[in-house]
């Protein structure tokens, strides 16, 4: 392909990237760094660019930055959880399927620069390719704006969704609470749905957890399962404080 074609693709990227960063309320200084973050090896090969101009090195860096950022978040948010649970949570949050979920929430895949063949074969929606681009973007953001900017990005794109039903099972507070009650010989734990509100496509469920038939905590979520998890989390934390 010609350099003219490459420049046209990069100009299109520059505009879309500026719009995306504005939407995310993020600043940037070094545009070529982000061009590299979204450059798949197929794009580099099509235009005979430097063999290290693709995003794999930034992906490597972004992976480590994400692990650090998520580790700090979990450490602060769940002071009662032991190391094993925190490790399990972190692994689930930074795994490929989760990163694809986060990337898709902000349509990050539309920024990826692909070679002609990769584009034709559906590379833009390939999970491994999308998650790699997400990590590379985080790596570029870290180099360009520092860890504070990565934290700001994570507060908008990652942290609010850690307990979404899509990622549920990362921390199973129902099991945590059940095990705590068993250790304390406190009796039987049950759950009941006490309220549903909102239209079918955006329901809000409220559940409560009962100990020996007596309500001890309530929780809300977008699914019944999530509301039960929230109720169990509150009951678990309250019980640990006693």
UniProtKB/Swiss-Prot annotation:
HAMAP family (alphabetical): RNase_III
Record protein name field: Ribonuclease 3
Family recorded in the similarity comment: Belongs to the ribonuclease III family.
EC numbers, comma separated: 3.1.26.3
Binding residue positions for Mg(2+): 59, 132, 135
Catalytic reactions on record: Endonucleolytic cleavage to 5'-phosphomonoester
Main location: cytoplasm
First-level EC class: hydrolase
Gene: rnc
Species whose genome carries this gene: Staphylococcus carnosus (strain TM300)
Keyword set, alphabetical order: Cytoplasm, Endonuclease, Hydrolase, Magnesium, Metal-binding, mRNA processing, Nuclease, RNA-binding, rRNA processing, rRNA-binding, tRNA processing
């Amino acid at each position: 392909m010609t350099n003219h074609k490459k420049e046209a693709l990069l100009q299109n990227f520059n505009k879309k990237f500026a719009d995306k960063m504005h939407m995310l309320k993020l600043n940037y200084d070094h545009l070529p760094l982000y061009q590299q973050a979204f450059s798949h090896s197929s794009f580099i090969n099509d235009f005979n660019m430097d063999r290290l101009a693709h995003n794999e090195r930034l992906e490597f860096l972004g992976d480590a930055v994400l692990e650090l950022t998520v580790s700090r978040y979990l450490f602060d948010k769940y002071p009662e959880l032991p190391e094993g649970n925190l490790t399990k949570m972190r692994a689930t949050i930074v795994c490929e399927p989760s990163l694809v979920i986060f990337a898709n929430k902000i349509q990050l895949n539309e920024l990826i620069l692909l070679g002609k063949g990769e584009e034709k074969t559906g590379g833009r929606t390939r999970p491994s390719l999308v998650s790699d681009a997400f990590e590379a973007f985080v790596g570029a953001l870290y180099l360009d704006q520092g860890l504070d900017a990565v934290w700001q990005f994570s507060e908008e794109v990652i942290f609010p969704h850690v307990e979404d039903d899509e990622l549920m099972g990362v921390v199973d507070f129902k099991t945590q609470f059940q095990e705590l009650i068993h250790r304390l010989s406190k009796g039987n734990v049950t759950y009941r749905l006490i309220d549903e509100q909102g239209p079918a496509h955006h329901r809000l469920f409220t559940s409560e957890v009962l100990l020996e038939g007596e309500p001890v905590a309530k929780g809300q979520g977008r699914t019944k399962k999530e509301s039960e998890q929230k109720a169990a989390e509150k009951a678990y934390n309250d019980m640990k404080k006693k």
